[in-house]
Amino acid sequence: FLIENLFCEGEMNLTYSHIDRIIVGGVVPTTQPLALMAGKALGVDFFLERRELGAINIGGAGKVIIDGEVFEIGPREAIYIGMGAKSVEFTSDSVETPARFYINCAPAHHTYPTRKITQQQASPEKLGNAENCNVRTIYKFLHPSVLPTCQLSMGMTVLEPGSLWNTMP
C-alpha cells in the first residue's frame, strides 16, 4: 500500500496496518525532539510496552534517546529498541540536514536488548545484474544473522550507479 508524506520536516508520521499490526513511520526531527507517544489506539501506557521498534537513518546524523540513554545514529545506521522502553525521542544534529528515521514497529512477546547497528555490522546481500539495471545491495540491519528480535526484520537497499529499480525484499 502507499503511505504518502512519510518524511515531513519537523514531524513524526506513523501508519498502523491492521494486516500485521505493524506500524510504519517516518521521523524527521528539526528544531525539537520528536517523542513516541502511546495514544488510545494502542491501549497501553507507553508506546513500546508490548512492541519492538527498528529505525534506519536515511538522512543526516541524529540521535535516539531511550529512557535517558543517548544513541548516536549516523547516516545509514540503525537502532533496534526492545520491548519495554518507556521513553523514546528522536533528534537531529543539524536543522539543515536533519536525520530521517524510517521506522517499523511490531508486537513483541520478549525483551531483547537495545542495540545500534552500523552499516558495516549489517549483513549485506548483493543482488541483480547490470543488464537489467538492478545491481543493488540489501543491508540487513535487523535480521537473525545480525541480532535477535521477536519478529521484526528490517533492511535498506542501496542501488549501484546506473541501476534503476529494486524488487520487494
Residue ranges and their predicted role:
Residues 1-6, 10-13:
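A structured, charge-rich N-terminal accessory region that forms the first stable segment of a protein
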Residues 10-41, 135-169:
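A short glycine-rich, His/Asp/Glu-containing loop-to-beta-strand
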Residues 35-37, 72-76, 115-117:
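Short amphipathic beta-strand/extended segments with alternating polar/hydrophobic composition
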Residues 42-47, 69-71:
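Long alpha-helical, hydrophobic tracts
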Residues 47-63, 156-161, 169:
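Short, conserved beta-strand element in jelly-roll/cupin
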Residues 67-83:
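Short acidic-glycine-tyrosine-enriched beta hairpin
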Residues 78-79, 83-91, 165:
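Histidine-centered metal-chelating micro-motifs
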Residues 91-150, 154-156:
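Surface-exposed beta-loop interaction hotspot
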